[in-house]
Amino acid sequence: MKHTTLIRAIALAMLGVLAFSRAAAAQPPDAQGVVTVLVTPRPANTFVAAQALGAGVDGLGQGGVAKAYTPVNLRAMRSAGLGALTYRLRTELAVEAWHWNPSGHWSEGAKAQGYWTSEALAGAPISTCYGYRLPRRGSTIDQANNDGYSRLDDGDARTFWKSNPYLDRHFTGEDNAKHPQWVLIDLGRRRPVNAVQIAWGTPYATQYQVQYWDGDSSGEDAHSIDDTFGDGAWRMFPSGAEAEGRGGLVRLRLAAVPRSVRFVRVWMTRSGGAPVGTGDIRDTLGYAVQEIGLGTWDGRGGFHDLVRHTPDGKQQTPITVSSTDPWHQAGGRDPNVEQPGFDRVFRSGLANGLPVLMPAGVLYDTPGNAAAELRFLRARGYPVTRMELGEEPDGQYVTPEDYGALYVQWADALHRVDPALGLGGPSFQTAIDGWVCWPDARGDRSWLHRFLGYLKRRGRLADFSFFSFEWYPFDNVCAPPGPQLVLAPNLLENALARLQQEGLSRRIPWLITEYGYSAFAGEAEMTWPGALLNAETVGQFLTLGGSAAYLYGYEPNVPIHEIEDCPTWGNLALLLSEGAGRSPRPLAAYYAVRFLTREWAQPDTDKPQTVYRAKSGLRNRLGLPLVTAYAVHRPDGQWAVLLLNKDPKKAHPVTVRFQKAKSGRPVSFSGPTDLYQYSASQYVWHPDKAHGYPSLNLPPRHLQASGRPLMLPPFSLSLLRGPVAGLP
């Protein structure tokens, strides 16, 4: 999940606070708002509810899979009414190889090590599967449990980082200079640097540069690797180029006078390979480094290392790498990362008999393991029509060209098994300001534009049949949620517009494969803000032409504390876990989902439902909506209008009208109209750290609308549904 910086999140929250401070002047307390549904000749979108309103299942902690997939939990999950399912791949975020079948084959079978391929033949049921840690890991930080460490500064000369062999010209068919591999060191603050020490492994780089980040035009220092994607530049140290590297222990004096730098990277463009006869060709490809140091030479020729060397990811100097070799060993199973087994998922009933959007491990896996996965699913007879390749390559700092090169190889392997299989991705993390990377030679920083360009140059754009991304818009779970919610529609609309500007075709499906309030745990997720954001995300995404949205947090869960300097507890969850054998309690998010699956969209039908745009007159002086609306015309002929009041303190009256044409007279609901409302009258969250619970927990109220302006309670969901005379 791509995280905006805290500064950006605070800025957005401040903008929202300003919006709310001006709202009173813009909208008197007794002002009536008008919501107008624009009944245009062509609807904004068409969808099938079971296919468009979905959820995701993910990897869990130790013992978590068996605890989550109990009969009582599965009944509660299915009762939310969600249809399609996507399988999320936590092992890919953990920098681990995925053994989706515990049975399989090692490339070095006698030693139970090497490159793994799970067994494709259907055998015993698979209930749980695991990730395996990579002993050639280079990055300190990962996006899962973050309990690993880099081998580049672990202080052990016997270990080493090695880049992914599938990015070598042997597999890509391209010159290695087109897929430079790199190591980036973050010193934490500006430090004097004029020397580097590299203990090369095998294979080593024969051509490389040592570069430093020079900052952007604002004059502000970069605080993370993400900040180096701005308009600054990587500059080579005066003596930072090596054109004829010979491996071994190398000490380079980079400059006569130390430079004050924070970020330094080693940029590798040519490999010396490994000696012939070393066995598996993959062991001979790429680059390997045993240990790296960075610092200064003193006047007596001594090297003063600024890098902290320890096998502890919390203590060592943070390092990020371009890729990692998926070679591993049988003893590397991570007990803290479990994935639900395929048989457990497909037999759970959660997919409702629909095709499941399945992943293939890419960044830390092999094409053969992906092909075996597909053969297994076909042998079992499980419905799979699409596979998502990898997870969050952008958040793991993989360049678009490297991901593209892997994508093409995986597409070849999978299409040899099933030429009709739909492939897509890249499962972007959330990026409020766009998905960017270091600029290429043309200055292009757009991750998506460059990925699409790579596929086009390779003649492989047809292999990209759907686009997927995640949407968690609010990093700052400590900020007041009301002001943030007001910003939500603009954030999503701008993100989608940017994607189209960068070349993403509207002719392929766009999928939100995870959505929720935040990538971080906070109380907002357990109560109204999370419920409202979820409903808004689905309604707006479908209105803007999206194909499907998959909720994250399907499994029952409990509040957790994640942000050290903020006393907030929460989680992305529909249901509050009550322990073994007990029915989980529904949360606000659960009832918000049922608003969509049971009342807004017509349930239990595979007929298409049409979405129409709706505009709200309840806006503040900045033009930001206090009330938003999403309208659907159902197969049963009824119109359903979902109304969200994102004002945490004030109720707002609204009148819903339907405008068939600009010159036509607005019409209203004309027959018996159902009203559903869900607000603080039905749900109140009692915060108590890990033991928080709903102190009031009732389903939405249902009554007949009176025909008068409808009063929307503060922080509430409302829905009007009925016939409209003169409209089909």
Regions found by a protein language model. Give the residues of each.
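Disordered, acidic Ser/Thr/Pro-rich linker "stalks" and the adjacent N-terminal cap
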Residues: 103-190, 201-204, 214, 225-242, ...
